A protein has these predicted regions:
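Ser/Thr-centric signal marking residues that sit
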Residues: 6, 43-44, 81
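A short linear-motif detector with a strong N-terminal bias
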Residues: 15, 43-44, 135-136
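Acidic/histidine-rich helix-loop elements
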Residues: 10, 35-43, 72-76, 155
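Alpha-helical cap/lid subdomain in secreted, periplasmic
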Residues: 30, 48-179
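Serine-esterase "nucleophile elbow" of acetyl-processing enzymes
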Residues: 1-40, 50-59
Length: 179
């Protein structure tokens, strides 16, 4: 469950990190079906409102939550973002799923204090709910010395070249959950 970073925004269908994850699972002889419930532009509030129906419909063993970036870009209250992430993790766990939370960072123009608080919210949710966490989903992309090579012209959405890196950021932590 995610936003445009997982919904293949601006990419050729089948080239995003979630599609690459399905291929990786097959290569590893792990028979899991991946359901991409990501919507471009989604916030944690949107994800929270959709999650119960998705859990009921798909009855997943694992839920990856990649949300929060749009909350930050829209300047939504941090407490609301954290509460929504916490609620989603709890709901997924109550439905019997293991949760993997993908952390994000705020753009630097929001100031260092807000950026630290935003990043800390993901750690707090993971600690409170005892979920797995990828601290920064865009590690090696958003913090690359030459980040423009990894982004579409809008400088927000990772391009096709970044997708394998995004999967590489998720895979080690997810693989531990799948065993």
């Amino acid at each position: 469950m995610g936003d445009s970073l997982s919904a293949e925004y601006g990419l050729t269908r089948g080239t995003g990190w979630v599609a690459l994850l399905q291929k990786k699972l097959a290569q590893e002889n792990l028979s899991f079906e991946v359901v991409n419930a990501s919507i471009s532009g989604d916030t944690t509030s949107g994800g929270r409102s959709r999650l119960a129906a998705l859990l009921k419909k798909h009855q997943p063993n694992h839920v990856i939550i990649e949300l929060g970036g749009n909350d930050a870009l829209r300047g939504l209250p941090l407490k609301m973002t954290e509460d929504n992430l916490l609620n989603m993790a709890r709901a997924a766990q109550a439905a019997g799923a293991q949760v993997l939370l993908l952390g994000m960072q705020m753009p630097p123009n929001y100031g260092p204090d807000m950026a630290r608080q935003f990043e800390a919210a993901f750690f707090q949710v993971a600690k409170t709910q005892k979920t797995a966490l990828v601290p920064f989903f865009l590690q090696g992309i958003g913090d690359d010395p030459e980040p423009l090579k990894w982004f579409q012209p809008d400088r927000i959405h990772p391009n096709e070249a970044a997708q394998p890196r995004m999967l590489a950021n998720v895979w080690p932590t997810l693989k531990k959950q799948l065993k």
